[in-house]
Each structure stands twice: as structure tokens, then as C-alpha cells.
């Protein structure tokens, strides 16, 4: 393979402008294939470029949703350098509109890469904090795929294996980035979680995280890491049975009471976050943005995501407040208007 040129300006949440620039570069150099080398952002960018090449007369925004491409992409090879998004095996690409900052997903089987290369050595240089948040992203994929209402025997098995691998290897990879076994196992976990949620989808953790990434540029893995225990707890009894089953399978709990085992499972996730210096809140979320963000999340999740419990925008607004790191400005405003939660 002769690499004609490379596009290296992809941002953490790839924008429609990134896709158009990379597409123009592909055409200018007469390229015949796409090689996505990097994390989820690079792979999503490459997928979206392929979609634009396959459907040159269809704007990217018109591809939002399910099965809007219907054309084969150029050859696409994915080489993940993070163990998190699982984009090397999924049918999704998540893009942010450069003008409106609306973050949306394109879902089409043609977006699944033709080849995925899982090579642990390319992840050795990943900083500890990115190792942590991308790993928790993979955990979110696996858990949301498992607790949803559209699972299969295969997706449940893939989710369980991914969760166990992450519990056993993520903190090792965080502490020692050159541990080949931990890095290899995390790549496998990410891949398995990707195969699971491609068929069983995700849930409200992702819907809220996508809106935060689009509006504020918050890295997707970080948003998922912070939101995961909060959203799981908010599901309440609707998720207890499946979370309890995961707790027992992974050895987190031996309680026969589903509520207790589920709580211990969620607390284990919190402990993992703490051990890897992942914060409990997210900075920069503005109160005035929350209703709009909740509507974005609601539009993304409903009715596509088979979540354990169905929420509307008002319930989703609570999730933003729960992860919000209150600024001095908002603290003053809330003291003047005590009816508004922070």
C-alpha cells in the first residue's frame, strides 16, 4: 500500500468541517482507500469521509440516523491507538456540526471497517488519563449494551467478557502503560464491547455525553466515565436485576439481593474512577444550556435506544445537573433564584 497523503487535523469531537477537508484531500490525491490510525475521533472522521465519498451529493447532516448511506465505502482499514470507542468494529460514526455544535450519530452497516488491526504496541504511549477515560468508555459500551432491552445471547456474552477484561486490566494499563498483556486485553475488550453495542445499542449515558461533547467539546470518554455511575443509579429498580447479574458474574458481589448487588456494582465503578483520578463532575456546563442539551439527548435516544427505563427531557435535565461543576457565576444566580437546581 502506498500512502498518498494524510489528514491530521481531526479534533477530539470530529466536525463536519474536518470531514469535508479530509474528503477534499482524498480526492485531490486520487486516493483509493482510507486508513484510520488513531482513537475514536480519527476512526469516526474516516468513516464519515467514506460516507461522503460514497454519497457525494448527500450532505452529512442528511445521513444522521439509521441506514441513510446505502452505498459501499472505499476500502477502510482501522488501527485503533486507544482501547475505548470500539469504532473499528461498529456501524456508527459520531460527528459534530461545525456551525450548530449539534453532535449526532450516523449508523449504517457500510460504516463497519473492512479490516481492524489490534496491535497493543501502538497503545503504549497513551497517557494514563486517556487510558483511563477511553477504557471507561469501553466499559460504558459493554454495560449499556447488556442492560438494554434489545440483547441477544451473543451480545450478552460479548458484554460480559468485555466487562471482566476491563475490570481485570484497565487499572494495570493505567499504572503501567507498557504492560503488553493489559494493553492487548483492553484492545480485545474494546472490540468486544463494540460488537455488542453495534447490535444492542447504548443508552442515556451516551445520549447525554454526546450532547456535552458537541456543545462544550468535552472528550467523549471523560463524559461517559463521569456519567456512567450516575445514570446507572438513576435507572433504579429498572436496571437492578441485570446489574446484579453482572456484579455476581464478575465477582463484585455475592449478595442474593438484586438491589444490594447492583449498588455494589455501581460503587465498584465509582471506585475505579477514583483510583484513576477521574473527576465526579464536569466543568463548564451552563444552566441556560441544559434544556436544549436535554432535548438533543432525548432526540438521540428515543425511540432508538432500548434503555431500561424511558425518560423524557425533564428527567434528562437532572443528569446534567448531577454532573455539573457549579461555577461561581451559576452559584450566585442560583442563590438569587433558589427554585433552579445546580
Describe the function of each predicted region.
Residues 1-3:
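Short, small-residue-biased leader/transition segments that mark boundaries at the very start
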Residues 6-16:
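Short beta->alpha junction loops
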Residues 17-24, 28-121:
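Glycine/threonine-rich beta-strand-loop-alpha-helix active-site module
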Residues 92-200:
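Carboxylate- and glycine-rich phosphate/diphosphate-binding segment that chelates Mg2+/Mn2+
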Residues 139-143, 186-194, 208, 228, ...:
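Short alpha-helical scaffolding segments that buttress acidic/His motifs in well-ordered protein cores
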Residues 200-270:
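C-terminal catalytic subdomain
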Residues 243, 253-342:
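C-terminal charged capping/lid subdomain of soluble metabolic enzymes
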